[in-house]
Amino acid sequence: MLQFSTGESFTVTGTGIVGRNPHAEPGEYFDHIVTIADPGKSVSKTHLEFGQDDGYFWISDRFSGNGTVARDPGGEPRRCEPGRRLRISRGGRVDIGDQFFVVS
């Protein structure tokens, strides 16, 4: 489950994208398209992609303007390199602009 700073939560059952106004590129398919309210526009239109692989949750920054930072419980912040998957532990926090979500 993803719990967002906006108060929303989503159960993850596949892949998805997150952003202010996210859209898939031609030929892409996602199980979830998650729109985040962000009046300050710190979150990009299509900010990041997420999914699960071998029981691990991962994120991939979609070349967002403000980047994506992940923090595993008790760990140091890690910047997500655009276009590369980064594994996130349960309880980890993902910062996207002025918003964030927690993986539970």
Where are these regions (language model features)?
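Short hydrophobic/aromatic patches on the structural cores and recognition surfaces of FHA
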Residues: 18, 46-50, 57-60, 66-69, ...
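ATP/adenylate-binding site constellation spanning eukaryotic-like Ser/Thr protein kinases
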Residues: 15, 64, 85
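Short polybasic amphipathic segments
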Residues: 1-3, 67-70
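Intrinsically disordered, low-complexity acidic Ser/Thr-rich regulatory segments
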Residues: 1-41, 100-103
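C-terminal boundary/linker segments immediately following FHA domains
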Residues: 18, 52, 71-104
